[in-house]
UniProtKB/Swiss-Prot annotation:
Listed GO biological process terms: aspartyl-tRNA aminoacylation
Binding site for ATP: 220-222, 229, 492, 544-547
NCBIfam families per the UniProt record, alphabetical: aspS_bact (TIGR00459), PRK00476.1 (NF001750)
UniProt xrefs under Gene3D superfamilies: Bira Bifunctional Protein, Domain 2, GAD-like domain, Nucleic acid-binding proteins
Protein name: Aspartate--tRNA(Asp/Asn) ligase
Bridged cysteine pairs (disulfide): none
Span list, region Aspartate: 198-201
Keywords tagged on the record: Aminoacyl-tRNA synthetase, ATP-binding, Cytoplasm, Ligase, Nucleotide-binding, Protein biosynthesis
GO cellular component: cytoplasm
Length: 598
């Protein structure tokens, strides 16, 4: 080894002769004595090049620049009194160099490595190997390593077996587009990269493995967001002879144990509340609510229906919904700020937004007067009606009530989005808190109005509630599913369900989704045949590793916790991928590139 110790030295190392190797983090010349901060993965330590100790070392010290790779030998000493640095773990000690060797020089980096400054993301991704040298990125990857290590150890202790499944599989589209791989040996035929190992892990249950997991790489050719990538990693799990309670207990223990092990400084709830899908949509406007703050959606349809406000009366008469949320402390918003909120509501599909300001002074609701109320709706609403709206939405004097009216689904979506965005704007979220919950009682199917057909809410392998089975023939939209999601801070971090394990029921679900028997046998025949050889009851779940590590690291994009991610256009800026390939490679695959028509 070219080093005997890491740079994470402490007072326990005083008097020890060490050989260190790393990168020059900073260099300072103090009148003939040169100080450098030497950095490796574990830490940073100050090294002194003093001519009284070694003139040759000083000459090398004069050559050093930021990011040079350096090996240095010396003795660990206490820093002189008054020169200690309490901001560094190694700030009480220094290394007096007696020998040094430049292992490699370095060009000037395109951005500062030694300062946590904002850098354009495209530049960071192009020079990702330099970006990872920065402390924030390095810490994120270490958190990821610790999280995955804990997951493996936890599941191993629970009797799970880690089994790898194929990356090249058959295309059986499950929602998003597949990434296709043309076969050279079978012209005109294609493999697909797995969107998840769903069918494979179910087949492992048929095979009698009972408890399976893997850290699975998955691929989806879909539009990107801050929390999505074309390739992503999930902790894939499946168990035989379990029900929902077993799986939810496993998830609760896994996530709480993981946080306690990897980020014990974070606040988190050890028991996960359970929220029905319907309640989540009605109270929070989405099926992955952020529970770190209130601002629940309040239904005021009855008040609007009996009020003198024509807009509200018409919506209520047509069977629509009228709902409100309270923006705390925003009663003083001016016309421009309120207009910004109105435009935000319109962006998400609302025809408009009705703000009601309860004045600028904080107070209690019983003291509210009409003189304090400012709104275009004020002349149509009585004071008692406004107080009731405020009471339901949790508003008080000094707050701003925001009301949306229209189709219930749209109202929930708009106010749910506004709730989340206002929480960020108003700093209502504790970044050091993880608020877990289970979302349950999902419907099995949802109606696709555009395609005029039923779709799976989760995926077609999710089992229906046994009590709802008769409804599959008469009213599929009312069939409940045995699905369970884990949500945290506004993200779905794990989705799971008890699976269908009977061939006839699975075929029936496929029929409801619009597949005919020929399509079913061609795409899923292998699974249905396996179910005929004694498939056990089974269930599973798949926590998204990228997304949960993002929350553990306090980041807002999964790109911050992936070593070499794609950008938001699904491009790899470091390697320049996707790229043009050699014509011979295309010919060998028996395919032809068709230029897009302008």
């Amino acid at each position: 080894m070219l080093k005997t110790h890491s740079c994470a030295l402490t007072q326990e190392n005083v008097g020890t002769e060490v050989t260190l190797a790393g990168w020059v983090h900073r260099r300072r010349d103090h009148g003939g004595v040169i100080f450098i901060d030497l950095r490796d993965r574990e830490g940073i330590v100050q090294v002194i090049f003093n001519p009284e100790q070694s003139a040759a070392c000083l000459d090398i010290g004069k050559e050093l620049r930021s990011e040079y790779v350096l090996q240095v030998k010396g003795v660990v000493s206490h820093r002189p009194a008054g020169t200690e640095n309490n901001r560094m773990p190694s700030g009480m000690v220094e290394v007096v160099a007696v020998n040094a060797k430049i292992l490699n020089a370095a060009k000037t980096p395109p951005f500062y490595i030694n300062e946590e400054v904002e850098v354009d993301e495209s530049l960071r991704l192009k020079y990702r190997y330099l970006d990872i040298r920065r402390q924030g990125m390095k810490n994120n990857l270490i958190i990821r390593h610790k999280a995955v290590r804990f997951m493996r150890e936890f599941l191993n202790d629970q009797g799970f077996i880690e089994i790898e499944t194929p990356i090249l599989i058959k295309s059986t589209p499950e929602g998003a587009r597949d990434y296709l791989v043309p076969s050279r040996l079978f012209p005109g035929k294609f493999f697909a990269l797995p969107q998840s190992p769903q069918q494979l892990k179910q087949l492992l249950m048929v095979a009698g493995m009972e408890k399976y997991y893997q850290v699975a790489r998955c691929f989806r050719d879909e539009d990107l967001r801050a929390d999505r990538q074309p390739e992503f990693t999930q902790l894939d799990m499946e168990m035989s002879f379990v029900d929902e309670e077993d799986m939810m207990k496993l998830m609760e223990d896994l996530f709480t144990g993981l946080v306690a092990n990897v980020r014990p400084d974070m606040k988190y709830n050890k028991k996960f509340p359970r929220i029905s899908f319907a309640d989540a949509m009605e109270k929070y406007g989405c099926d992955k609510p952020d529970l770190r703050f209130g601002m629940e959606l309040a239904d005021i349809t009855d008040i609007g229906a009996s009020s003198a406000f024509g807009v509200f009366k018409n919506v209520a008469a047509q069977g629509g919904a009228i709902k409100a949320i309270s923006a705390p402390g925003c009663g003083g918003y001016n016309k421009s700020q309120q207009e910004e909120l109105i435009n935000l509501a319109k962006k998400y599909g609302a025809a408009g937004l009705v703000p009601i300001s309860l004045g600028v002074e904080n107070g209690v609701l019983k003291d509210l007067t009409m003189e304090m109320v400012k709104s275009v709706a004020a002349k149509y609403l009585a004071l008692e009606e406004i107080k009731t709206i405020a009471e339901r939405s949790g508003a008080k004097p000094g707050d701003l009530i925001l009301i949306v009216a229209g189709a219930r689904k749209m109202v929930n979506t708009v106010l749910g989005e506004m709730r989340n965005q206002l929480a960020v704007k108003l700093n209502l979220c504790d970044k050091n808190e993880l608020s877990f919950a289970f979302v349950v009682d999902f419907p099995l199917f949802q109606w696709d109005e555009e395609g005029k057909r039923w779709d799976s809410v989760h995926h077609p392998f999710t089992a229906p509630l046994e009590s709802d089975m008769p409804l599959m023939d008469t009213d599929p939209g009312r069939v409940g599913s045995r699905a369970y999601d884990v949500v945290c801070n506004g993200y779905e971090i794990a989705g799971g369900s008890i699976r269908i394990h009977q061939a006839d029921l699975q075929r029936k679900v496929f029929h409801l989704l619009g597949y005919n028997d020929e399509q079913i046998d061609e795409r899923f025949g292998h699974l249905l045949e396996a179910f005929e050889f004694g498939a056990p009851p089974h269930g599973g779940v798949a926590p998204g590793i990228d997304r949960f590590v993002m929350l553990l690291a306090g980041e807002t994009s999964i790109r911050e916790v992936i070593s070499f991610p794609k950008n938001q256009a699904a491009q790899d800026l470091l390697f320049g991928a996707p790229s043009v390939v050699d014509d011979k490679q295309i010919k060998d695959l028996h395919i032809r590139i068709q230029a897009e028509k302008e």
